[in-house]
Amino acid sequence: SKHMRKGVSPLDSEIQQLAGDILNHPRFQQLRDFQHHGESNSVYDHSVAVAEAAYAIARRMRLSGDETASVIRAALLHDFFGYDWRDERFRRYLRQYSGVGRLMRMHAFIHGHIAAARAKQTFGLTERECEAIARHMFPLAAMPRTRIAWIVTLADKAVASREMAAALGGYVSLACRKLFAYN
């Protein structure tokens, strides 16, 4: 696989202890196969990075053990949608709709709800954990209502911004080299 994380996850042992059932589950491992924010970034890579960031926030806020566990579990599963949104099948599905109907079915708007339902079915998450997953795309989704949901949302925004900057950085430097080449 061309994706960055291989073998044993470098996660903190406490995260491993609180979410080992998720990290080691075959359906979670399948997220390695879906490209996410850039060519060298998989949904698995992104989800683990969001969990690490969310864990750091939870520790800084001195959340209880139970709340910290919920933050980690929701963060790991916030993108547990289980499909490749770049795939032709998804594009075909979208082409049936137009206007606002198409817009509201786009990946950015729907994947939180799909991930929450899939996470609940696969891992039996709590309602608060599912809500954090469903609302992590605020402001494209409803506003988070709990600390857990806000932490997952903020961790996701921070990690996604870093990943997109890295992915776009290559294009920006290439464009600059072409633009300012002195030939």
What are these regions (language model features)?
Residues 2-94:
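Acidic/His-rich, divalent-metal-binding segments that scaffold phosphate/diphosphate chemistry
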Residues 46, 78, 111-112, 136-137:
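Histidine-centered active-site/metal-ligand motif
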Residues 49-57, 109-122:
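An active-site-proximal "capping" alpha-helix that borders the catalytic cofactor pocket
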Residues 56, 60-62, 93, 161-183:
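Extended, folded domain segments that form the structural surfaces/walls around functional sites
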Residues 75, 120, 125-176:
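Histidine/acidic-rich helix-loop-helix segments that form or flank divalent-metal centers
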Residues 93-118, 175-183:
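Divalent-cation-assisted or electrostatically stabilized phosphate/pyrophosphate-binding catalytic cores
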